[in-house]
Swiss-Prot record:
Keyword line: Kelch repeat, Repeat
Domain F-box: 24-70
Name the UniProt record assigns to this protein: Putative F-box/kelch-repeat protein At4g35120
SMART domains in alphabetical order: Kelch
InterPro entries: F-box/kelch-repeat_ARATH, F-box_dom, Kelch-typ_b-propeller, Kelch_1
UniProt Kelch repeat ranges: 128-174, 176-225, 227-273
Length: 389
């Protein structure tokens, strides 16, 4: 009987994509304009990995054209910039969020960082971060430096009219407001505050709210709606830019807990939020009352007993919480504090729900993990600003 010759099965070769594969080469052969349009649609969190694919990718992802393209097609996204004061120097990071995991990525500055300034004030405006005033070697400064978050280059901006230390700042309707931080003799004059017009690049004086107005070192500044609020030990004031005047004694509601860099937003309405010793509460401007944020038990369970909330930041309508905890070490049969801390971040999505008792604010923990495993106990969070890039 004839037997058919059976051919042995052929080995299937696996194709491994490398920088030299036809697919990669075909992408590289496309015009930069087309590649740029594709890359602009991808989340910025992946740019660090994509820049390792090829030199052309690195060049495109490092250019200003990629951010211009993202802005043109409406693909911008919020990006928090965190500045940590580590021993003898400042370090800038961006907060990346990939597949529910948060991480701090070092920023490669394209230009030298300005001299270390103690007690300066920092504020985000558009795609830029302004660092204003402070002291250099014990001397007060009027200097203003701007970090372009597209190019990561520092540049000088026009100096303030008055040198300021420990001032507070905020961004409202195309202007940067800087309050306080000047000498007492200047607080009583037209120099208690200044306004920087981004279009004209000029500083203008902001008049004093009242004759007896005095700014203390712990004064606070907040933006709610279309008004600027200044809170001092004695009085609270609101400034209406549209009317160009101060509204005195607006403190019928306790504004002290709602001021600072922390604020959240629901349906584009800014409603400040504050941290209590163990829980977080939300201030409802419509009800003029504080409400406990529900649904955050997962967050509370993760925090240790030695935590300290550093900052709460509006993160594109979500709430970014940054805090530090002592690293505990085992000493015999007990836990003691080490000389180092770890930094945590959490992203909370907030929404308003109706209940039998009325509207409630609920939070859902989207991400929560350690972003810096170890820092010296002397570290400080110099600033956290969220820009749109």
């Amino acid at each position: 009987m004839d037997t058919a010759k059976v051919e042995p099965p052929q080995e299937t070769k696996k194709t491994i994509l490398t920088a030299q594969t036809p697919l990669s080469m075909s992408i590289s052969s496309l015009p930069d304009e087309i590649v740029l349009s594709f890359l602009a649609l991808i989340s910025k969190s992946y740019y660090r990995s994509l820049s390792l694919v090829s030199k052309s990718f690195y060049s495109l992802l490092s250019s200003t054209e990629i951010y211009a393209a993202r802005s043109h097609i409406g693909a911008t996204e919020p990006c928090p910039y965190v500045c940590l004061w580590l021993p003898k120097k400042h370090r800038w990071f961006t907060l990346a969020e990939i597949e529910g995991k948060l991480s701090l990525e070092p920023v490669r500055l394209s230009s030298s960082y300005p001299r270390t300034r103690v007690n300066s004030t920092t504020v985000a405006a558009g795609t830029e971060i302004y660092k204003i005033g402070g002291t250099v070697k014990g001397k007060r400064s009027r200097a203003v430096f701007v970090l372009d978050c597209w190019t990561h280059r520092w540049r000088r901006a026009p100096n303030m009219r008055v040198s300021r230390v420990g001032a507070k700042s905020c961004f409202l309707d195309g202007n940067i407001y800087v309050i306080g931080g000047c000498r007492k003799s200047e607080e009583e004059s037209m120099n208690c505050g200044e306004v920087f017009d981004l279009k004209t690049q000029t500083w203008n004086p902001l008049p004093s709210p009242s004759v007896n107005y005095a700014v203390h070192s712990n004064h606070k500044v907040a933006v709610s709606g279309e008004r600027l609020y200044v809170i001092t030990k004695r009085n609270n004031y609101a400034y209406d830019p549209n009317e160009g005047r101060w509204l005195p004694d607006v403190g019928s509601v306790d504004l002290q807990p709602i001021t600072g860099p922390w604020s959240g937003g629901i349906e584009k309405v800014m409603k400040p939020i504050t941290g209590r010793p163990w829980k977080y509460t939300w201030y409802s401007s419509s009800h003029r009352a504080w409400q406990r944020v529900m649904g955050l038990d997962v967050l509370y369970d993760k925090r240790g007993c030695g935590y300290r909330t550093i900052q709460l930041v509006n993160y594109g309508g979500k709430l970014l919480i940054i805090w530090s905890e002592w690293i505990m070490i085992l000493d015999g049969y007990s836990l003691i504090r080490s000389q180092e801390k770890e930094i945590w971040c959490a992203v909370i999505r907030l929404e308003e729900r109706m209940s039998y008792f009325g509207p409630q604010i609920w939070g859902e923990v989207e991400s929560c993990n350690v972003v810096v495993p170890s820092v010296p106990k002397s570290y400080q969070l110099s600033s956290c600003q969220c820009v749109s890039v």
